[in-house]
Amino acid sequence: MGNQKLKWTAEEEEALLAGVRKHGPGKWKNILRDPELAEQLSSRSNIDLKDKWRNLSVAPGIQGSKDKIRTPKIKAAAFHLAAAAAAAIVTPTHSGHSSPVATLPRSGSSDLSIDDSFNIVADPKNAPRYDGMIFEALSNLTDANGSDVSAIFNFIEQRQEVPPNFRRMLSSRLRRLAAQGKLEKVSHLKSTQNFYKMNDNSLVQRTPHVARPKESNTKSRQQTNSQGPSISQQIVEASITAAYKLVEVENKLDVSKGAAEEIERLMKLAEEADEMLVIAREMHEECSQGKIMYLN
């Protein structure tokens, strides 16, 4: 038997890879019996080869289902960014040409290496307002079977001013509210979409929101301050962009976790198939020699 505590050497790994290329994965006994590889793998067993091949086969960026996939420390960074944005709106700086976005604090965990195309995240500052929009839409869309994301989005878009990527953010907010028990998620056997409707907790948790009408030609009272609107707009855009990225990262982590579980399931099935094949071959060899085998 092999010694699993003995660290694998480069020669042993090369011999294992050469054996898999020659005999195929799962043919551990054949690899150990190969005259060209027997010397390098003399201290290893078929179980050692199987475990080592599994470690080499799993992609380095994917963890098994038993390992918890830890969310990157970016949620706190997004919240700090939104908090700084709110503070800057309340007490704007009066420096001549400095941009308020440049004054936002940066930490080591806030430097996100994320593709620029992933620009959706929930804005924690506007989350209560978005929840109010959702509750208002479901209150008016009185469907006993629930309403899907498209119906809720169309209702809100016709009555409120929303960001360009509000549809994706709406889907995330609906899942969160359903997980918190504030909405009821309805499942349909023949549908791949999710449907939502109000429940008893929705009436308790519902918070009124101030409706934001679509743009009109009315003048704002804050036009007396020439720099105020532009500063607030830049800060809000920065906080929304940071929040959008958080939701996209969470979605990608869910996909990664599902892929890891599927890979582990397929590998387990392959191992079981290899073991059954080895047993069948041994039985065939015994029977071909005229021996009688008894099956319990």
Swiss-Prot record:
Source organism of this protein record: Arabidopsis thaliana
CDD domains: SANT_TRF
UniProt protein name: Telomere repeat-binding factor 4
Known role: Binds preferentially double-stranded telomeric repeats.
SUPFAM superfamilies given in the database record: Homeodomain-like
Compartmental location: Nucleus; Chromosome
GO cellular component: a single term: nucleosome
UniProt-listed PROSITE patterns: H15 (PS51504), HTH_MYB (PS51294)
DNA-binding region as annotated in the record: 28-58
